[in-house]
Amino acid sequence: LQERLHFPEESRETELNTVNEEMQRLMQLINDLLNFSRYQNGLQKLTLAPCPLEELLVQAQGRFSEQAQQQGIDLLLEIQAPLPRLHADRAQLERVLDNLIDNALRHTASEGQIRLQARRHGERVIVSVEDNGEGIAYGQQGRIFEPFVQVGRKKGGAGLGLALCKEIVQLHGGRMGVYSRPGQGTQFYLALPL
């Protein structure tokens, strides 16, 4: 820092912003590691309450609509009504949706499309996030939910996001899967019990 005292003030501001961004990234990594550890060790408990799924999806779309618009990506919401209320941990399901939408935005090119979909299927609700991005190589699909695994050309984070998502969905008594064709896009889906 003493060496930087001689830099122009604009440069110092830029450097401090970079340090702050990296610090935030590291804090997120530490939080992800701690959260994943809690899930793996059975220490994470859900706070279950009635959860209006349609509202959850509308809000998730809203959180990412500006970013999608800036990237030139259509973020669509397709709901087959009526959707039942789930008995779920809303904050944890928001985390799952946010992670899936964020991943889709990172792996979808400009003028692409991301669809948030939800429908009832028997005694389950199926929620999916589907993009027409780069897709996932067939050889990588079997490992996609393992911790610290990253796929695709645009990597970021520690490779814990999808592993955390799967843990959260399983803790709700559901299951999570992926369907992808390289070069044609990816669909992550979760099946949650009513």
What spans do the regions from the language model cover?
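Short alpha-helical segment of the dimerization/phosphotransfer core of two-component systems
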Residues: 21-26
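Conserved micro-motifs of the catalytic ATP-binding
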Residues: 41-46, 85-88
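Conserved catalytic submotifs in the C-terminal HATPase_c
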Residues: 47-52, 69, 74-84
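Short beta-strand/loop element within the Bergerat-fold HATPase_c
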Residues: 111-123
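Short conserved segment of the HATPase_c
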Residues: 136-148
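Short alpha-helical Gxxx[C/S/T] motif in the catalytic ATP-binding
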Residues: 161, 165
